[in-house]
Amino acid sequence: MAAAAAAGSLLLCLLGLALPGSALHTKGSVPLDTITFYKVIPKHKFVLVKFDTQYPYGEKQDEFKKLAESSGSSEDLLVAEVGISDYGDKLNTELGEKYKLDKEKYPIFYLFHDGDFDNPLPYSGHIKAGAIQRWLKSNGIYLGMPGCLKEYDVLASKFMSVTDKSERQSLLKKGQQSLEKAKETEKKSAEQYLKIMSKILEQGEEFAANEVVRITKLIEKTKMSDGK
């Protein structure tokens, strides 16, 4: 199942404990308060901030954890979170008021660009790691999926955007040349990119569509077997 999921990710690329006064820390995410919020955001090109209860849990928080851990693949993006409590010490309520946040709609995601505090871009889609990743990508942010490589993502994007066979052959050759310089830890993933690109060159666009169907069925079959 793991191998199928990894192959699926590459194909799609082609197409603690709480401290007093802070929210629970999530790996890959930076906890912010009313002071650090204004210090940290201007230092990064993009900052995705999750506004939530002080101690979030459940399925949506699990999706956020996946997203935060995957953010290490982006040089331009910082993932952060603000825990808001409207009782007791009433932590970070000023930020909730500033952005007119409805606690019934938590978690709420805002994307800040170039330190602009007044015009953040709100996310209104499903709280799923993959959906948020696609939204970030649509806003010009690179955020690789597991097993993906930025250099080959760019190459694959160019490959899929052209239809001329000679142009595709040229891009494939470029990828093969880059493979020789790739780190040992990246070679296996790079080879998968080249393998898929070669298949598309030989068989056409139908290969990608058929492969998605095949891998999806394989994953579903494995899940059914595991559930027995």
Curated annotation (Swiss-Prot):
Pfam families: ERp29, ERp29_N. Keywords: Endoplasmic reticulum. GO terms for cellular component: endoplasmic reticulum; endoplasmic reticulum lumen. Its main location: endoplasmic reticulum. Coiled coil: none annotated. GO terms for biological process: protein secretion. It is found in: Endoplasmic reticulum lumen. Does not seem to be a disulfide isomerase. Plays an important role in the processing of secretory proteins within the endoplasmic reticulum (ER), possibly by participating in the folding of proteins in the ER. Homodimer. This is Endoplasmic reticulum resident protein 29. The lineage of its organism: Eukaryota, Metazoa, Chordata, Craniata, Vertebrata. The gene is ERP29.
